[in-house]
């Protein structure tokens, strides 16, 4: 039996330190008239923190779970039901095809940068091209809302999978955590949008030789789609010993998003595009998604070693890049059509990995 290792966590905050962090949300002088009310709310929040009220609203799991009496988070249960509904629709051959286009840049004109991103323009080209397909619905997910939208958050992955795969639940049950104030987690909605799609197109810039933080946050939180446990009651929530025992007895590592097709548009200005494109394609391949052909995996420089200030003008002038981006969209549309008709070639689909993980 594997041993659960302890000793890293520094422990709970003091009452004073907790209060400082809580009150930091109310530094605007406009809140001064409500200091007494804020103090009462602080005490409620402190009690929730001290007593670990992660999921204050629960209900019995019910039939179909390993422990039907286990008190599951109502919020998690509702997310799960939405995913099951989206999956049923996605697998129904009578429904319209759906492609999720994701703008992965952090920049937009609604906050500090003051200008839209080139990535958004490229994602819009993808959306425009897909829009010409009669049987395709397009869903545009703009991750820059993390930087400009009130309360938008993708909390970081806590790494449960490294303790044991069954401790990582599908969908993620780490959030919301009301005791720690870790709420408004966007991933509950994002999981549903991935599940609903037949095709995915990621459009991303390169930040410091790699993907932007909004995209990395989403990638990490999608680990539960690759081997995640759909039954939190089997591990009594977050019991690491039970999860380790369950994995050691044999775990199937279910790929909850496998079989969808994908395309990539990666752009940069001086370096890093090939490594970023490779990292993303390897990640999607690992999760069981299918690339839409060589033309669907694009990496290009825009305004190579030119000033940042004129990079939009450089994009304006690169007509060939515009057409290459359109070809990514066309390749994905073609792949979705072939996939849903059962005609997409997948020579390795019957193979089983000798090293499942």
Q: Where do the language-model regions lie?
A:
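Cysteine-cluster motifs in flexible loop/terminal segments that predominantly coordinate metals
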Residues: 146-190
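Glycine-rich phosphate/pyrophosphate-binding loop and the adjoining helix
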Residues: 2-98, 120, 271-274, 278-357
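Short beta-strand segments enriched in small/hydrophobic residues
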Residues: 97-109, 263-266
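A short beta-strand-loop structural module common to alpha/beta enzyme folds
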Residues: 134-147
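A short, Lys/Arg-enriched amphipathic alpha-helix followed by its capping loop at the start of a domain
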Residues: 122-135
């Amino acid at each position: 039996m594997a041993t659960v290792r302890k000793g890293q966590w520094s422990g709970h905050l003091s009452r004073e330190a907790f209060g400082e962090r809580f009150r930091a949300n109310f530094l605007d002088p406009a809140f001064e008239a409500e200091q007494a009310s804020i103090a009462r709310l602080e005490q409620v929040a402190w009690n929730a923190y001290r007593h670990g009220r992660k999921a204050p609203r629960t209900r019995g799991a019910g039939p179909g779970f390993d422990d039907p009496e286990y008190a599951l988070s109502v919020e998690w249960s509702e997310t799960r039901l939405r995913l099951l509904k989206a999956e049923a629709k996605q697998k129904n051959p009578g429904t319209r095809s759906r492609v999720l286009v994701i703008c992965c840049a952090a920049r937009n004109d609604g906050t500090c940068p003051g200008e839209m991103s080139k990535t958004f323009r490229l994602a819009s080209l993808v959306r425009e091209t897909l829009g010409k397909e009669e049987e395709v619905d397009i869903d545009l997910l703009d991750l820059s809302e993390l930087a400009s939208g009130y309360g938008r958050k993708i909390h970081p992955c806590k790494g449960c999978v490294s303790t044991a795969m069954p401790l990582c639940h599908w969908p993620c049950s780490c959030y919301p955590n009301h005791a720690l104030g870790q709420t408004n987690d966007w991933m509950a909605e994002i999981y549903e949008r991935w599940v609903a799609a037949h095709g995915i197109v990621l459009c991303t810039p390169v930040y410091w030789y790699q993907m932007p933080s909004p995209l990395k946050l989403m990638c990490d939180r999608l680990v539960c789609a690759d081997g995640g446990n759909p039954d939190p009651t089997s591990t009594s929530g977050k019991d690491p010993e039970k999860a380790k025992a369950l994995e050691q007895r044999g775990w199937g590592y279910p790929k909850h998003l496998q079989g969808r097709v994908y395309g990539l548009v990666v752009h940069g200005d001086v370096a890093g595009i090939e490594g970023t494109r490779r990292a993303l394609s390897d990640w999607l391949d690992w999760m069981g998604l299918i690339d839409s052909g060589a033309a669907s995996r694009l990496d290009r420089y825009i305004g190579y070693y030119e000033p940042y200030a004129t990079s939009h003008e450089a994009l304006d002038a690169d007509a060939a890049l515009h057409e290459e981006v359109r070809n990514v969209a066309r390749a994905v549309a073609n792949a979705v059509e072939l996939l849903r008709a059962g005609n997409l070639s997948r020579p390795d689909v019957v193979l089983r990995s000798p090293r499942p993980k």
